[in-house]
């Protein structure tokens, strides 16, 4: 098709992905019902598989539209930016609910818990051991992703590769240390409201670190395939925004749950 | 003036004349003073003599007007009395003042025009030229996130961040890793107490044996209702407490075991004694030999 048009917008082609995405979401939530009532996770897993296949191919098509077909004009890019901003806003509100639950319990602990926080029977983590190291790791990954971004804007391919590589490496290192902390934890998710809120907040943050690391890894692969130019690299910028968001959430987690609440 | 006042009582027509004359006198006085001040303002550089001459001329004009008033009849006097003062003042003021005032206005207008021109010129240069929306991203066009100017990309930015990353941040990570893992020590676990808010089990888990969490640690995580795994019999964890019947049965079995143990122990003791005696006999024989 010709790239000439008398309007700046992207009239999307026919695509099966919205339909298969809806099927995947429905299968996932039906699978949750089956899981909770019948102790069977097969339908839930099937729903997740359908969703993963859908998002992979949907984003593959978006990359093709933007990189090879030239359909991402300035107006389209503005729309993508607002989409990403609103998504990150919804993630912020998602984590607000976990912090709300934590503060609800920690600011006025019940008499059954011993009227103290952490509750009786709980030993909390030392915040100046592995949690402090994890904080340094995420802050460092923020610096390396900024290095990659500046290199990309200066048309420096090798420096961008190095910056992205180090960022992904630090994300994986964070995940390894967090898993080690989980294994060595002196409390479980079933140990009072402390264990529940701790593992919910840090668990979802850990999942978001995995998602962000995957996002950056995909950007690294696209960069190695020369998808980005110094002027047109919104996929990378979205990954960087998301990574900075994950970093900031960890700072709040560290200060409130590990340090103050420990 | 006195004649006119006396004429009031004789003939009412002259009363009207007196009123008109008084008004004209007051007006003429004001105008004469006004013209004098205007002249002074306009002719700031002139001498005092010229100002005196102007005053004399105004006085002469006033006298002439008075003479005209006396001579004319009443109707004709009305018409002629009104027109002369206006003409005099208009001629005197108009011819002198405009040359000084107009240039100021013209200069101010010119300045305004010049300012507006400057603003227009500056506005053109400072105004942000928006990119056409149909422009396809890429090539030599500006960054999508910035309108107008292309960002001045300086190579120092990436070099700066490279130095911060490689020589500042990554070594810090390595040092912190060494510090953390070298000073790490194993913590002691708390004594087990079956609090109501701890070790919650409302349903069995859907993974493993249904009683252990996903990240279960056998040393640090206790299991309800018994406690830590290495302190209790694992096979009894999670089961219901035994009933009295079960306890009696268990005690019966225990008693049987105890009886058997005692029998075997007594037999074993006797056997040991025999063996000891036999050993002594052999020892004595060897000594005799």
Swiss-Prot record, chain A:
GO terms for biological process: mitochondrial electron transport, cytochrome c to oxygen. It is found in: Mitochondrion inner membrane. Keywords: Membrane, Mitochondrion, Mitochondrion inner membrane, Translocase, Transmembrane, Transmembrane helix. GO terms for cellular component: mitochondrial inner membrane; mitochondrion; respiratory chain complex IV. It is a multi-pass membrane protein. It is an enzyme of class 7 (translocase). GO terms for molecular function: cytochrome-c oxidase activity. It comes from the Eukaryota. PROSITE patterns: COX3 (PS50253). It catalyses: 4 Fe(II)-[cytochrome c] + O2 + 8 H(+)(in) = 4 Fe(III)-[cytochrome c] + 2 H2O + 4 H(+)(out). The chain crosses the membrane at residues 39-59, 83-103, 120-140, 163-183, 198-218, 240-260. PANTHER family: CYTOCHROME C OXIDASE SUBUNIT 3, CYTOCHROME C OXIDASE SUBUNIT III. Belongs to the cytochrome c oxidase subunit 3 family. Component of the cytochrome c oxidase, the last enzyme in the mitochondrial electron transport chain which drives oxidative phosphorylation. The respiratory chain contains 3 multisubunit complexes succinate dehydrogenase (complex II, CII), ubiquinol-cytochrome c oxidoreductase (cytochrome b-c1 complex, complex III, CIII) and cytochrome c oxidase (complex IV, CIV), that cooperate to transfer electrons derived from NADH and succinate to molecular oxygen, creating an electrochemical gradient over the inner membrane that drives transmembrane transport and the ATP synthase. This is Cytochrome c oxidase subunit 3. It comes from Drosophila melanogaster. The gene is mt:CoIII.
